[in-house]
Amino acid sequence: MRILHVVPTYLPARRYGGPIVAVHGLCKALAARGHEVDVFTTNVDGDRTLDVPESKPVDVDGVRVTYFPSPFRRLYWSPAMRKALAVRIRTYDVVHIHAVYLWTGIAAARAARNARVRYVISPRGMLVHELIRRKSRMVKTLWLRLLERRGFDAAAAIHFTTVLEGQEAARIGLPLPSPFVVPNGIDLVPRPNIARDENTLVFLGRVTWKKGLDRVLEALPSLANVRFVIAGNDEESLTPKLRELAQKLGVADRVEFLGPVYGAAKYELLARATLFVLMSTSENFGNAVLEALMMETPVVLSQEVGLAAEVARAGAGVIGLEEVPALLHDRGRRTRMGRHGRALVESRFSWPRIAEEMERAYAAL
């Protein structure tokens, strides 16, 4: 199959977190299965521009990636991408569009309709009622009604990463033709042979309001001698407010902010953690959850995390901070959870398996 993925940003723009890594993992795994995979994206990297060739293909792990310049960065508008879509989109069997509220998705859907090419849309967690309500509600509502609706209506299918994400999207009122669920995957690596810390909670991810870091801080006063390590890019400048809250709660000496952590250092951090915590108010999937499970670290999740129910069923973690004290005092239970978590990742979330599932979904369009 010839497959085109259209995404507003791409590696090496790691500041955008899990969705970027997930899209690249999927593209790489599809290419490894023999498919011809192209990515159209922009060179936007926050307020900077990626140091990559413009408007010509670059090989990234076997995936042909074309980075187009974007004069209007906020919406990722790119005349060069529009021209390329008009010329080349009819050469693909399937177009896979990632993200909403951005020009790239609207342009790709329009070009695919004009060329009568089947396309799939992955909202990537952006169609969540609570997120729309809390941030730019009027703008997002009008955008969906006036600009996105036609694209969704004509899509061959809508892809979600979890059942929960699909349920949330259904509340928005957009047409969701032929919805299907294929989760994100992960590249399997062994757990490093290092000792695990005692009484240490770890969060890994983008530091944003929806991640529920305040929930964990507010629980710390009742968790004597427990440290909380926060690792991730602070794209909303929340760290000063979180430090202030920790000071107010009297736990500032037990909270550590590491900033972004990548590669081997990331896995060492997760492998040392006693527990991984993610108390998001909204989380369509949670790639860091898979990374923690792969390091045999039990996870503590809010019920709003898309993976929470599956993790709990597998015995690899718990839902709710109220479970933390009992877990901290039961090393045997944590060890069993760690083994269950690793087994879950290996059996369900390896990229070869996920690519095979997505391939079947494409073939069924």
Task: Describe each region flagged by the PLM.
Residues 1-53, 57-61, 90:
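N-terminal subdomain of nucleotide-sugar transferases
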